[in-house]
């Protein structure tokens, strides 16, 4: 499942998915695969993204990741 709300948040904060991937320390392939729903996120991935995207409200986490 593609994550359109997640992609929007990434673009709003980092301007490109590539810049977000660089900031989080992921390969370009992993970043695009996660954002496009081709790779499942681990709990660690979600935790890293929440920190970088300033997400701390459970409702917002639900919108971004589930």
Features from the language model and the residues they span:
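DNA major-groove recognition helix of helix-turn-helix/homeodomain DNA-binding modules
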Residues: 44-60
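A short, Lys/Arg-rich alpha-helix, primarily the initiator
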Residues: 1-15, 19, 23
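Recognition helix of helix-turn-helix/homeodomain-like DNA-binding domains
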Residues: 25-41
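Residue-level signal for the short linker/turn that defines the boundary of a DNA-recognition helix
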Residues: 15-16, 41-44
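Alpha-helical residues within the helix-turn-helix
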Residues: 22, 33, 51
């Amino acid at each position: 499942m593609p994550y359109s709300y997640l992609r929007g948040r990434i673009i709003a904060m980092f301007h490109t998915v590539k810049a977000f991937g660089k900031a989080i320390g992921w390969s370009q392939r992993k970043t695009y695969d996660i954002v496009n729903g081709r790779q499942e996120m681990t709990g660690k991935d979600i935790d890293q993204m929440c920190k970088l995207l300033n997400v701390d409200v459970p409702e917002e986490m639900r919108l971004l990741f589930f």
